[in-house]
Amino acid sequence: MTTILKHLPINQRVGIAFSGGLDTSAALLWMQKKGAIPYAYTANLGQPDEEDYEAIPRKAMEYGAEKARLIDCRKQLVAEGIAAIQCGAFHNTTAGVTYFNTTPLGRAVTGTMLVAAMKEDDVNIWGDGSTYKGNDIERFYRYGLLTNAELKIYKPWLDTDFIDELGGRHEMSEFMIQSGFDYKMSTEKAYSTDSNMLGATHEAKDLEFLNSSVKIVNPIMGVKFWDENVVVKAEEVTVRFERGYPVALNGVVFDDSVELMMEANRIGGRHGLGMSDQIENRIIEAKSRGIYEAPGMALLHIAYERLLTGIHNEDTIEQYHANGRVLGRLLYQGRWFDPQALMLRDSIQRWVASEITGEVTLELRRGNDYSILNTVSDNLTYKPERLTMEKGDSVFSPDDRIGQLTMRNLDITDTREKLFNYVETGLLTSSAATGLPQVDNNNLSSGRGLQDKRQ
């Protein structure tokens, strides 16, 4: 039995994720005129570019919605964002600059909370504005069906009748005007923007071309730190964590996690912290490009990982990074609530995040330029007296180290024998300069690698 409806279901309740923009406004009005019973659901995600959330449901009612609801998703969104920080659930990085998966986090919250609200209203058909080429269509599909097993999916943008009548923004605007609504299209930007309180995504249009840089973007959460005319003053900030959770900024304790994230955004945003330019692999394996903002997430992430490296041992940190990358990819794919993701989340939060208690002081400058000024924690295993280069008491003696090095002789002997065995098989070549077998870089640079030598 199919879950995707290709044509508008007449005389049935159809829920639509309603943003108040031209696309969803025209879709809602069109569905109502064609005989469906539209219900509008708007997620309050703390979007930095939204001025009046309360006005959005009122618009939906004007356009013909049977019912319109505003769902406050902010607290849940921040909870999921902090969980992602605790787990390092970020897999897209370029030269150490991270994308904080803010859109996938928003979809996880929206896709579950809106469908749960629809279920309360006995609405079992859902539509949203995602296109068939992107990631969101699959994310919403998964989260929707996980939340309501009886859910059917109807998307106007997959309905040929809708596309034939209102296939472009101009046609949508004319349709609204002809229907008695003085709806004017907003000025077209050179790119598309989607945001929530964790971060903003800028993509498409001019940004699809790699010779269009971050410089064409007007940040909505930060500043144009690349513009020399923009004054950005250095600023010190202290972040405190308790058992993996951020609790204070600059000595101010926040009981409300939403307010803490908003303040972190304000602090990081003053510097353009957390902006990144990424080429990534969509769920369908095609590459796309996005420019991202996430000032608060970046600030908390830096402080969290500073404490992490001072508290946990090398093997734990390695597992944190490895599992975090896997978890980040699952999040990106719309699998944040799947068992394989929950397993990784639980283990990292239980055994890694629970020990992250302390304070980190940073100096923020322009963009992602910062310095760590101080790190304080009762849980630090970093203890300078253990390895001090100065004369004094030590936890081990020179004789202890001699014994430890002597134990390495077995491994060194075995390794040396293997290297010379590789010379005999042709995998390595002898080197008079170093006395050790070496990879033949001349062969590698001419296009011949180890596989050629095996033949």
From Swiss-Prot:
Q: Which reaction equation describes what this protein catalyses? A: L-citrulline + L-aspartate + ATP = 2-(N(omega)-L-arginino)succinate + AMP + diphosphate + H(+)
Spell out the molecular function terms from Gene Ontology. argininosuccinate synthase activity; ATP binding; protein homodimerization activity
EC number of this enzyme: 6.3.4.5
- Cite the annotated pathway: Amino-acid biosynthesis; L-arginine biosynthesis; L-arginine from L-ornithine and carbamoyl phosphate: step 2/3
Name the InterPro entries on file.
Arg_succ_synth_type2_subfam (IPR023437), Arginosuc_syn_C (IPR048268), Arginosuc_syn_N (IPR048267), Arginosuc_synth (IPR001518), Arginosuc_synth_CS (IPR018223), Arginosuc_synth_type_1_subfam (IPR023434), AS_cat/multimer_dom_body (IPR024074), AS_multimer_C_tail (IPR024073)
Q: Name one GO cellular component term.
A: cytoplasm
The answer, when asked if Disulfide bond is one of the entry's keywords, is no
- Origin superkingdom: Bacteria
Sorted alphabetically, the Gene Ontology BP terms of this entry are:
argininosuccinate metabolic process; L-arginine biosynthetic process; urea cycle
Ranges for region Disordered: 434-455
Kindly list the positions annotated as binding L-aspartate.
Answer: T131, N135, D136
Q: Where does L-citrulline bind?
A: Y99, N135, R139, S192, T201, E203, E280
Q: What is its main location?
A: cytoplasm
Instruction: Name the enzyme group at the top EC level.
Output: ligase
Q: Which residues are noted in the entry as ATP-binding?
A: A17, F18, S19, G20, G21, L22, D23, T24, S25, A43, G129, T131, D136, D194
> Quaternary structure per UniProt?
Homotetramer.
Q: Family per UniProt?
A: Belongs to the argininosuccinate synthase family. Type 2 subfamily.
What's the protein here called?
Argininosuccinate synthase
Q: Which organism is it from?
A: Yersinia pestis
- Lineage, opening ranks: Bacteria, Pseudomonadati, Pseudomonadota, Gammaproteobacteria, Enterobacterales
